[in-house]
Every structure is written in structure tokens, then in C-alpha cells.
Curated annotation (Swiss-Prot):
Organism domain of life: Bacteria
Protein's name according to its UniProt entry: Glycerol kinase
PANTHER family according to UniProt: GLYCEROL KINASE, SUGAR KINASE
E.C. number: 2.7.1.30
CDD domains: ASKHA_NBD_FGGY_GK
Positions annotated to bind glycerol: R87, E88, Y139, D256, Q257
Keywords: ATP-binding, Glycerol metabolism, Kinase, Nucleotide-binding, Transferase
Pfam family, one: FGGY_C
The gene coding this protein: glpK
Family: Belongs to the FGGY kinase family.
Any single Gene Ontology cellular-component annotation: cytosol
Positions annotated to bind ATP: T17, T18, S19, T278, G322, Q326, A423
Upper lineage: Bacteria, Bacillati, Actinomycetota, Actinomycetes, Mycobacteriales
GO biological process: glycerol catabolic process; glycerol metabolic process; glycerol-3-phosphate metabolic process
Length: 508
């Protein structure tokens, strides 16, 4: 029989948009076990995206058990556990029964557009930006809460009586992990969130890290619904679920993009990462000073260690990244698989004058033009599939540059390099394009699944499993670095052509 060793590992639960994962790492930062399970995407009508919170909780239990069984360990051997999650996705439930009053409304869901238009018209964007760091749009949780209160029968009345809880997905999982309705030891389960998730609701004053009564009133949300806000890294409570991770301390909670920055070792002011997933998510550590963007970005909290002031960040999100490649594959059927785009794009030396502006749902950061629509410009009889494939990859790189330039203006200094992660960074042509279009080095780590890894690092820091940031940085390996090969003149000529193409996406 294998001898068990106390506190030899750290676990991380990564609850994402399409699946839930559990990873377990050792003290070298190596991932020793992984388990994952997808959940259903519920699409009741166009623009609506929902998840079943109960299914997700069931999947959490399943993947944690699978990851532990795979390496034959017990909770005794796990020092601590961290939780990361798809941000903004909204759940309201009855703590007396554990039953959600409605499906989780996912961050991608756009049903709250009309609520947001009315809110922006009444209050103006600047007030919300100055107070929360966010712009009023369909992403944050606040408008989703209001929609559930206004549209699900009986929910507003129950909320006003204090009978219901709201949470983003971290809050829902923490409540279940710490006992839920069972209360094995008679103690109430935690109803908490961390500052990074709270900062994505439109309800938290980013200056004080507390819920803002005036903002809650503007959205007509009872404050009794809201969880307690806690630092990202510190002592939450031990797991009180007999089935999984019994008595393991929860010591780290982060929203997914902040967790990815943590997993990249983005601890210094100016450190910046881009996650190339369904969309593109750029986050820059701006240090202890809050910077409210003047160039179309959002301000958020990168992380907070218990007993310390928060560390802030600038964020720019682009809606179309990997999803543009999926569109090429599934809707146009132009490529057989997503990875095949690189092979086709390499067949030509340039885009042949073709540009694709993927404003399928408008343009997001830093332009924020919801009425823009996707266009393909520069088509001639000379253009072929290879040129279009190249234009798709270039669109990803150009959109990233737009956000990077905005970050540099807000931060008052140029980026020295960009750290990258996510599935698309396996496309080496795209990464070279990115270095060329930015004019800086692009750095890919050894493990590109940095969201789960960053959560494990945060939990390990919170429990003392890892000593400090320096130790964590030593554990992060660099797999590859791309350096610019374009001249400055070539770079700016290409960027000017992109900007010209974007003008055709605007309504006339």
C-alpha cells in the first residue's frame, strides 16, 4: 500500500464556460492529475445562454473525485484548494432548499441589453465607470440579477424578504463546498465572494471594495441578496462536504482571467497577459493604484491578499478570437478542423489585400461600438481560402494590438512583452504575427492552461504551501518566445490597412 503524505499537494477547481476541471499540483508546480467534464449549454432563444447550476455542482464533485482517484490520494494529502470561475455568470437560489430559482444566466447572454440601454440613458456611463471601473453592458452580473427579479414569478418578493441568495459561480460553489443546506456541524454554509468576482457585478465600489447601496438601488436589487466580499487569497473555511475534500482549507478564489494572470506570474506592475480563447482577454497589472481607463478599457481588481491592499488591473475583452476560427470551420466549412487554419494560412506570404473585421456582435474593447457588423474587405478574384485564413489570424492579432495600445496609453508606458495562454497559442503562425504586429516579444509558458494553475498557486500561497511570489515565479517555465520580424514601417502600414477596414464595419 502506498504511504500517504500530509499536505503534499494543492487542488484547484476551474469552473469554466463550457466545462469544469480539477487539477492537482505538487510542490514543484507540476500538474500531477487532471479531470474535466463538460456541461450543457442551454439556449432558450437567440442571445440567451444559460447553465444548470445543479449540473455544474454535480460536475465539480465528479471531477474532484476523478482527479484524486487517478493518483490514489486522500483529502489528508491536499494542503488546500482554490476555486476559479467564469465571471459574471449569475445564480440566485434558496438557501433553505439549495434549489436555484432559475438557471444560471451566463456572461455571454445578451437579454439584458434593453435594461442596460435604459440604465445608461438615465445615469450615463461615466458615473458607473468612475464608481465600478465598468461600462454598462450585458456582461456584468447586476443587470442579470435585475432580469431574474423582474421576470421570474415570485422571486422579487422572496428576495425582498431576505429568503434568497445571489452569487456568481464562485459563490454558488463555495456555499455548496462549505455545507450547503446540510450543515454537517450545524454551522451555516458560507455566502461569500472574492473581490475579483465582486468587481464584475456593477454593484461594487471599486475604491472601497464594498457593495454600493446607491448602485444597488439604481438596479432595484435588495442588498440582502448579496454575499460578503472577501480577499482573493486567505482563509475562507475548510470544506464541509463529506463526499469530497473533507476538511481541506479553501485558501484562494479568483475570477478566471485574474487567475490566468496569476498563473503567468503577473505580480509586477505592467505585467500583461492575453488569453486566446473563444474571445480575447487582456489583463494588465497596474499595481496598488486604481487607474480608471480613458481609452475604452475596464478597471478591475487583479487580486487581493488577506491583510493587504488590493492590486488593480486594466482589462480589455474582445468577443471574437477562437470563435472566429470556429465560424470559418462550422459556418463557412472552409477548413476541416480549427488547427488546420495554420496550414492554409502558411500557403501565402500575405493576406492578398483581404481583411476580416469580426464585429458579429458589435465591436468590444476598446472601440465599444455595438452597432458595428462583420465585414470582409479587399476581395478580388485573386483571393482564395488561404488569404481568408490568414486574414482571420491577422484579425486576432490586430484586435489584440488595439487593446495593447489602449493599455499603454492608460498606463503611461509601453509594454515590454506580452505573455500568452489559451488554446490558440498553439498556432505558431498566429504568435509570430502577434509579435510582428505589436513589435514586442510574445512569451508562451510551458503550461498554457494558466487559469487552473494560477488558482492552485493562489491557494498554495494562501495556505503557506508556497512561500512567496518569487518561489511561484521560479516554477513557471517559458516554452517559447517569438520576437518581431517586421520592420516598423511594415508594421504601421499593415495596421493602417486594418484601421481602414474597420471603418467599413460601422453603420452608414
Amino acid at each position: 500500500m502506498r504511504a500517504s503524505k500530509a499536505n503534499a499537494y494543492v487542488a484547484a477547481i476551474d469552473q469554466g464556460t463550457t466545462s469544469t476541471r480539477c487539477i492537482i499540483i505538487d510542490d514543484t508546480g507540476a500538474v500531477v492529475s487532471v479531470a474535466a467534464k463538460e456541461h450543457e449549454q442551454i439556449l432558450p432563444q437567440q442571445g440567451w445562454v444559460e447553465h444548470d447550476p445543479v449540473e455544474i455542482w454535480d460536475n465539480v464533485r465528479a471531477v474532484v473525485s476523478q482527479a484524486m482517484v487517478a493518483i490514489d490520494i486522500t483529502p489528508y494529502e491536499i494542503s488546500s484548494v482554490g476555486v476559479t470561475n467564469q465571471r459574471e455568470t449569475t445564480v440566485i437560489w434558496d438557501p433553505a432548499t439549495g434549489e436555484p430559482v432559475y438557471n444560471a444566466i451566463v456572461w455571454q447572454d445578451t437579454r439584458t441589453n434593453e435594461i442596460c440601454r435604459e440604465l445608461a440613458g438615465e445615469e450615463g456611463q461615466q458615473k458607473w465607470l468612475d464608481r465600478t471601473g465598468l461600462l454598462i453592458n450585458s456582461y456584468p452580473a447586476g443587470p442579470k440579477i435585475k432580469w431574474i427579479l423582474d421576470n421570474v414569478e415570485g422571486v422579487r418578493e422572496r428576495a425582498e424578504k431576505g429568503e434568497l441568495y445571489f452569487g456568481t459561480m464562485d459563490t454558488w460553489l463555495l456555499w455548496n463546498l462549505t455545507g450547503g443546506i446540510r450543515g454537517d456541524d450545524g454551522e451555516e454554509a458560507l455566502h461569500v465572494t472574492d473581490v475579483t468576482n465582486a468587481s464584475r457585478t456593477l454593484l461594487m465600489d471599486i475604491h472601497t471594495q464594498q457593495w454600493d447601496p446607491e448602485l444597488c438601488e439604481a438596479l432595484d436589487i435588495p442588498m440582502s441578496l448579496l454575499p460578503e466580499i472577501k480577499p482573493s487569497i486567505g482563509d475562507y473555511r475548510s470544506v464541509r462536504h463529506r463526499g469530497i475534500l473533507a476538511d481541506v482549507p479553501i485558501t484562494g478564489v479568483l475570477g478566471d482571467q485574474q487567475a490566468a494572470l496569476f498563473g503567468q506570474g503577473g505580480f509586477k506592475e505592467g505585467d500583461t497577459k492575453n488569453t486566446y480563447g473563444t474571445g480575447l482577454f487582456l489583463v494588465m497589472n497596474t499595481g496598488p493604484e486604481l487607474k480608471i481607463s480613458e481609452h475604452g478599457l475596464l478597471s478591475t481588481i487583479a487580486y487581493q491578499i488577506e491583510g493587504q491592499d488590493p492590486v488593480y488591473a486594466l482589462e480589455g475583452s474582445v468577443s471574437m478570437g477562437g470563435s472566429l476560427v470556429q465560424w470559418l470551420r462550422d459556418s463557412l466549412q472552409m477548413i476541416p478542423t480549427a488547427p488546420a487554419i495554420e496550414e492554409f494560412a502558411r500557403q501565402v506570404p500575405d493576406n492578398g489585400g483581404v481583411h476580416i473585421v469580426p464585429a458579429f456582435s458589435g465591436l468590444f474593447a476598446p472601440r465599444w461600438h455595438p452597432e458595428a457588423r462583420g465585414v470582409i474587405t479587399g476581395l478580388t478574384r485573386f483571393a482564395n481560402r488561404n488569404h481568408i485564413c490568414r486574414a482571420v489570424l491577422e484579425a486576432t492579432a490586430f484586435q489584440t494590438r488595439e487593446v495593447v495600445d489602449a493599455m499603454a496609453r492608460d498606463a503611461g508606458k509601453e509594454l515590454e512583452s506580452l505573455r500568452v495562454d489559451g488554446a490558440m497559442v498553439q498556432n505558431e503562425l498566429l504568435m509570430q504575427m502577434q509579435a510582428d504586429i505589436l513589435g514586442i516579444d510574445v512569451i508562451r509558458p510551458g503550461d498554457i492552461e494558466t487559469t487552473a494553475l494560477g488558482t492552485a498557486f493562489a491557494a498554495g500561497l494562501g495556505s503557506g504551501f508556497f512561500k512567496d511570489f518569487d518561489q511561484i515565479i521560479e516554477l513557471i517555465s517559458i516554452r517559447q518566445t517569438w520576437t518581431p520580424e517586421m520592420t516598423e514601417a511594415e508594421r504601421e502600414r499593415a495596421y493602417d490597412a486594418w484601421n481602414e477596414a474597420v471603418t467599413h464595419a460601422y453603420p452608414r
